[in-house]
Design a protein with these regions (language model features):
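A short beta-strand motif characteristic of beta-propeller blades
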Residues: 73-79, 123-131, 172-178, 229-234, ...
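Blade-loop segments of beta-propeller domains
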Residues: 70-142
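Short loop/turn segments immediately following beta-strands, especially the blade-tip
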Residues: 60-69, 110-120, 169-170, 266-274, ...
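Beta-rich, blade/repeat-based domains predominating
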Residues: 25-34, 38, 80-93, 130-144, ...
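Loop/turn-rich, solvent-exposed surfaces of beta-rich toroidal or solenoidal domains
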Residues: 284-362
Length: 398
């Protein structure tokens, strides 16, 4: 097992800009959305028009099993333009707005989902984030008090470096913190005043198709969350993507998946050090694309885009994950876990220039004591919209 120990270069002050949250059903710990005792009623899916000729859109799926329209598309909310590469999106801290990014177009679409959650309203379009922020390739949207952090993959011209950009809740530019080189995802541990970011490739390489391996990042960066100062850098395997902290104020570790290294790493903060260790080496071509940690910190879910499956690991010993269940999902991609840890939604589109020829769908995996099972009643077709075929990527619960 390879390990890289990183010494923090500054004492981490306690996060004092806002109280440390107890937890969230969103990637951002600051989002106040569903509680564990609440069943989701809606699933939002950020969706690309497959041929790029029509506007991209937010798909609204009925997720209430008591509803007569359960597991069907009940609405769509179009953007003001097509060809965006609808990739990731995220809530504001109050879950009243969705910030949805065009990875290739640099557009930002802000949707109101507070007024009528079943019918999102496009409240604002920012036509060029590169012009307003100085950076391009909006990827992760991570809510913080007073706004949203956006992980920008590259500079204004599509090269290096990437950055973490803060926007206010109306999408106005606040500030930018340049990365050493690459950018992909953001994860914050407010109790430690620590932010971790990851790597992929720069926009001008991603838009051409599969980026050459020498143009793909392997760096993970630790930041002072309050000041935006880089504290440390680590080099793992190629394309360390999703930053997933363990849940709860006392947690000091997390997981990150290296897509092109076919590996999963665990990190832990202890005695002033941040250390990374490779804990899973998967088969060549597996391409771990997304990860979710159950809210009781018992299980890690990993989607394998290349292998076409979702795996569930027991992480009671985080440094030694144990496979407990696996289900086949062609081109398994983004996942969304419910706060009660019982349902795992999964999409199957990665990127327009990387996807294979598979039927596009959103599926539901039921998680129980015996492991995972695909729900035959929840199989949502993305092949037959009014505008034709569409590609589902990121998802949010409501």
């Amino acid at each position: 097992m390879k390990a890289t120990a990183l010494v923090l270069l500054a004492t981490l002050p306690f996060w004092a800009a806002a109280p440390a949250p107890a937890g969230s059903s969103d990637e951002s710990v600051f989002v106040q959305n569903l509680r564990p005792d609440q069943h989701e009623s809606l699933l939002y899916v950020w969706t690309s028009d497959a041929d790029g000729k029509d506007p991209d859109f937010v798909t609204v799926i009925d997720a209430d099993p008591k509803s007569p329209t359960y597991a069907t598309v009940i609405a769509t909310a179009a953007t003001s333009a097509g060809g965006n590469e609808a990739h990731h999106f995220g809530y504001t801290a109050d879950a009243g707005r969705i910030f949805a990014g065009g990875l290739f177009s640099n557009r930002l679409f802000i949707y109101d989902v507070k007024t009528d959650p079943r019918h999102p309203r496009l409240a604002r379009t920012i036509s060029d984030l590169a012009a307003t922020t100085g950076y391009s390739g909006p990827h992760t949207f991570y809510a913080v008090p007073g706004g949203v952090l956006v992980a920008m993959l590259g500079s204004k011209d599509g090269g290096a470096p990437g950055a973490v950009v803060k926007l206010d809740n109306d999408g106005n530019f606040v500030r930018a913190s340049p990365a050493p080189e690459y950018m992909y995802d953001v994860g914050v541990k407010p109790e430690l005043n620590l932010m971790v970011t990851s790597s992929w490739a720069h926009p001008h390489n991603i838009m051409k198709g599969p980026a050459p391996m020498d143009q793909v990042g392997d760096e993970v960066v630790g930041w002072d969350f309050t000041t935006g100062k880089v504290l440390q850098q680590a080099h793992l395997d190629k394309a360390p993507l999703e930053v997933r902290w363990l849940h709860g104020a006392a947690a000091r570790g997390g997981f990150i998946n290296c897509a092109f290294g076919n590996s999963v790493w665990y990190w832990e903060v202890k005695d002033g050090k941040l250390a990374f260790s490779r804990v899973l080496q998967l088969a060549d071509g597996s391409i771990p694309a997304d990860m979710r940690i159950s809210y009781d910190n018992k299980f890690l879910f990993v989607s394998l885009f290349g292998a076409g499956s979702v795996q569930q690991y027991d992480i009671s010993s985080p440094a030694k994950p144990t496979l407990v269940s696996s289900v086949a999902v062609p081109q398994a991609q983004m996942m969304k876990l419910t706060p009660d840890n019982r349902r795992l939604y999964i999409s199957n589109s990665l990127l327009s220039n990387l996807d294979g020829k598979v039927p596009y769908r959103v599926r539901l995996i039921n998680v129980g004591p015996g492991g995972m099972l695909l729900d035959p009643k929840f199989d949502v077709d993305f092949e037959h919209f009014a505008t034709g075929e569409a590609r589902p990527h990121d998802m949010l619960l409501k």
